[in-house]
Amino acid sequence: RHCAITWLPGKTNQKFFQKLAYSIHHHDFESIDASQITVEGNQQWSLGVISAGLDSDVNERANRMTHFRGTTRYTLALLAELRAFPLHNYTVTIDSTKRTGSAILIAVGNGGQYGGGMKICPQADMTDGLLDITWVDPAPRRTVLRLFPLIYSGRHVNSPLVHTYRGSEISIESPDSMIYADGERIGPTPALIQVVPKIARVLLFREQMSPRNSFHRPRESRS
């Protein structure tokens, strides 16, 4: 028999766990997808968002700032990275489609949000057997600062700088970029990310659930 899993959130990505939580008095079970990540011959798993670029750069810097704690560390790391504003060159293959170029950020979402409620892949559905990809083009620092607050509502995807895709197998290659998943360091690219449908059976708590935190996202038409 398959065991169901649940969790007690204890780190910075509380919003992701709130999304998965529902029915403390009347518990329910749900089978959800997971992402299998292969880096340097090692396989790891993710239920949420996998990222490269600015997000992973911020995490790398924050992990070195051991004299600060909590959100202060990540805020200072973000400000430092925005000042340096490095760009990485990527080759990303989504199923059979390849894209090459510079990007500020690449996110691959099974779940759609991370980092305190940032909806980086707002249309991600953890039960559809697909991964959502968000690619952010290079832009002046001032433009990026204006774009950043829109991530909390998911409206950043309306910007011409942001491109969204969907696929079941994604490879990310870059000469100098790290991969992070669910806030944890995975390793350097190249990385192969594959969705495994309905592999995780989870126990959910209805008490904390709201319609906007549903597993199932209504699909909107995309250009």
Region locations from a protein language model:
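Catalytic core of DAGKc-family lipid kinases
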Residues: 1-103
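Short glycine-/acidic-enriched loop or helix-start segments at secondary-structure transitions
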Residues: 5-7, 117-118, 145, 182
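Glycine-rich phosphate/pyrophosphate-binding beta-alpha loops
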Residues: 51, 55, 107-121, 185
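Short acidic/glycine-rich loop or secondary-structure boundary segments that cap or lie
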Residues: 55-58, 100-102, 113-117, 141-144
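Short, surface-exposed, charged loop/turn segments at secondary-structure junctions
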Residues: 65-66, 121-124
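ATP/nucleoside-binding phosphotransfer catalytic cores, i.e., glycine-rich phosphate-binding loops
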Residues: 94-100, 125-126, 135-223
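Rossmann-like adenosine-cofactor binding region
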Residues: 106, 133
